[in-house]
């Protein structure tokens, strides 16, 4: 699998030419992760570039960094992710901003990011809810950050909470019933 991470369809959409598309088609399977930050980037030119890529059979996903004061509201992210789905780009990752030199004023708390995911989940299509992750320092990989929907167990029941913070119980799987049968 070839993965291309790029911002080209956003900042230089005219680069998506028939010649480039023919070249990309030669190297399959190929997936493209496009870096989007804000719904204002969904210009007609960007939309056309993404549609051309999708029409060429290239699966498209987005990678978005959560940035304080830029895209750290549920409404902004919802507008971005809905706009992406309309142009066949699946919101894939929402990254916690890395602690790099000069980025402190852009960083949010992890709790803020979880608040964003909770504000999306249950209020929009699941396709519009990306994975919220930290790209762990030192080669630790992407670590998902999830709201705590699993609340515990009691009397053979699992206790869960949904996006509205309502609690539900679900019957625990008992090993003697789950092996060899339906």
Residue ranges and their predicted role:
Residues 85-182:
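Auxiliary Fe-S-binding modules of radical SAM enzymes
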Residues 1-124:
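Conserved AdoMet/S-adenosylmethionine-binding subsite of the radical SAM
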